Regions:
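Flexible inter-domain linker/hinge segments
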Residues: 171-185
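Short alpha-helical segments enriched in small residues
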Residues: 2-171
Length: 185
């Protein structure tokens, strides 16, 4: 997929327009990758009906706020769950009790210099108060640039928002054979 197609994806724009029509809203904490999803959502009219708040902590110290105790490993499913539930609780503290919203936590490690040990990946969790759904995407280091990895993580966030908002549209992520999405219970 070329860069122009990545930016001007008509399905993405349709999903975002549907998100903006929904009575649901979201509050998010995103680190490492996935912030392009927020840019995409806010680039179309209606985002004030959808977005409550977005935080982008980037240092380990700022991420500790979302974890009840220091983690041995950042960029993990546990961290994304902690982020989603913490930001959901924060939203509950100041929103009307009848407000319908979800909390999103995304933590990612994508292509960098120098190359890190371990896989390029993202963990995304969505909390609606009762349930936390989490997914992991393992990304291709050899086939994707950092920009392409950011795009894939962002599109996955938008797809998960669509699912959470009961919108039937999804983008095809065009994953390579060495990439996979894992759904956690």
């Amino acid at each position: 997929m070329n860069l122009k197609d990545q930016i001007e994806n008509p399905t993405r724009n349709k999903i975002i327009k549907e998100l903006h029509k929904s009575p649901m809203k979201f509050i998010a904490v995103i680190t490492g990758a996935g912030t392009t999803a927020i840019s995409d959502i806010m680039s179309l009219p209606g985002s004030s009906k959808t977005v409550i708040e977005v935080l982008i902590p980037y240092s380990k110290e700022s991420l500790e706020f979302f974890n009840s105790s220091p983690l041995n490993k950042h960029v993990s499913v546990i961290e994304s769950k902690n982020m989603a539930s913490s930001i959901y609780i924060k939203g509950k503290s100041y929103l009307d009790k009848n407000e319908k919203f979800i909390g999103i936590g995304c933590t990612a490690a994508i292509s960098t210099i120098p190359q890190r040990k371990g896989e390029d990946r993202a963990h995304i969790s969505i909390c609606n108060g009762d349930i936390i759904k989490s997914v992991t995407i393992n990304l291709s280091r050899k086939n994707r640039s950092r920009l392409e990895q950011e795009r894939i993580v962002s599109d996955l966030i938008i797809n998960l928002l669509a699912e959470s908002f009961d919108i039937d549209l999804r983008m095809n992520l065009d994953l390579y054979d060495d990439e996979k999405i894992i759904i956690h219970n």
